[in-house]
Amino acid sequence: MINTIIIQKNLLLLFLLGVSLNSFGDINRYIRYTQNNLSSYGVIIDNKVHQLTKAPYLGGVKTGKTANLDKIILLAPAEPSKVIAVGYNYHSHRGDMELPAHPPIFLKLPTSIIATNESIIYPNGATDVHYEAELVVVMGKTASKVSKEDAENYIFGVTAGNDVSERNWQANDLQWFRGKAADTFAPLGPEIVTGLNYKDLLVQSRLNGKIMQSQRTQDHIHDIDAIVSHISQTVTLFPGDVIYTGTPGSTTAMVPGDIIEIEVEGVGILRNTISK
């Protein structure tokens, strides 16, 4: 019941604030949810969930069925074929390292994804698990070899993500895969929002209520259009694929019992508990 009340308050607040947000156009909020053991996509209108025929990034339309927010459980808002991430995309996180000509890219897995209110699980042998607050891009069209100038036309919307990372594995393994792609290491949500000006949104993390990271996406080293274009030169992006676009500042380890919140301006709060 507490989680349901939090969901209602967050979604209502976003609805009320929507008219004042810096946007590219009409702002729409899409979720994926379960009700009576059936999963669906939906759009939030007037504080009600309107069920869609399929994922909004696949052209889903309203079925005519609605649900109350207190009768649903939120799921991760996308079901991607690929979970791609960008490293060192803020000067505040990169420090004095030499700037790369292109965005450094790595992969997480669809099995890394969890929804808001689910638990981030420490893998066996993990000792130093960190949060990373990030804006996440959700693709809306198949993109292959697109230009930077055209990239925004392939983006459906944005959401919040946590690029959870095991720092010891990240530092000592030959590749980042184990330290980045473990189960539950890609919290995503709570919703996909279209129409936001993703080039200038505030990204924050809070650990047990304390602000740990806070910076705007306008400070990206490689902007989102450049990231989408660069990835699409070698990898075909499909609707629903997600791209974690980098984290600001420094991070610290999380321990079981901690609550980590990732908030992206206009998107809402992604909240997860740490568990063994």
Where in the sequence are the language-model features?
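Catalytic-pocket segment enriched in acidic/His residues
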Residues: 167-276
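A generic local secondary-structure boundary/capping motif
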Residues: 73-75, 94-96, 120-129, 143-150, ...
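Residue-level recognition of short, solvent-exposed, well-ordered loop/turn junctions
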Residues: 79, 85, 115, 130-132, ...
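Bacterial N-terminal signal peptides that target proteins for export
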Residues: 1-12
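Structural signature of FAD isoalloxazine-binding scaffolds in flavoprotein oxidoreductases
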Residues: 99-116, 131, 261-265
